[in-house]
């Protein structure tokens, strides 16, 4: 099925790094990475994201933000985005990637996973739970 998966959010410092690392734990044989549509290039993961991930057994150590590009899109068979508007942004950057782009929250009734950047610890915890639920559902589908 899909052996290369790219997880995309806006800045690539909160949601997509968590999604990447969580999904990688669930699917160790897959090549999973992340990027942002408006990435904070070379920035480490947001400290609140690092903390909520750590509390849930996920390490974001070594993560550096990177920009989604048309060239990058060609390296992945499946692109999972956090919000519906990311699908349009991906299509604008790499029109050829539209057909392989889906919502990370696809199996949660096409749910957007909101951006917790600069929000409360509770917001990060809530977003982590959505990412966790979505990752578990994607892993189930991608193992089949």
From Swiss-Prot:
Pfam families (UniProt xref): LMWPc
Any one GO molecular-function label of the UniProt entry: protein tyrosine phosphatase activity
InterPro entries cross-referenced by the UniProt entry: LMW_PTPase, Ptyr_pPase, Ptyr_pPase_sf, Tyr_phospatase_low_mol_wt
Residues the record marks as active site: 9, 15, 115
Keyword Magnesium assigned: no
UniProt keyword Hydrolase, yes or no: yes
SMART domains: LMWPc
Keywords: Hydrolase, Protein phosphatase
Enzyme Commission code: 3.1.3.48
Recorded family membership: Belongs to the low molecular weight phosphotyrosine protein phosphatase family.
Designated name of the protein: Putative low molecular weight protein-tyrosine-phosphatase
Protein source organism: Klebsiella pneumoniae
């Amino acid at each position: 099925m899909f052996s290369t998966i790219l997880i995309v959010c806006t800045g690539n410092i909160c949601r997509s790094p968590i999604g990447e690392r969580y999904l990688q734990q669930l699917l160790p044989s897959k090549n999973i990475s992340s990027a942002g549509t408006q990435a904070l290039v070379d920035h480490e993961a947001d400290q609140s994201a690092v903390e909520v991930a750590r509390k849930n057994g996920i390490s974001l150590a070594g993560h550096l933000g990177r920009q989604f590009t048309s060239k990058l899109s060609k390296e992945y068979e499946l692109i999972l985005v956090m919000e519906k508007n990311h699908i349009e942004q991906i299509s604008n950057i790499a029109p050829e990637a539209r057909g392989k782009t889906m919502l990370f929250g696809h199996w949660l009734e096409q749910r957007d996973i909101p951006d917790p950047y600069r929000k409360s610890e509770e917001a990060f915890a809530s977003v982590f739970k959505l990412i966790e639920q979505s990752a578990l559902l994607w892993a189930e589908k991608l193992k089949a």
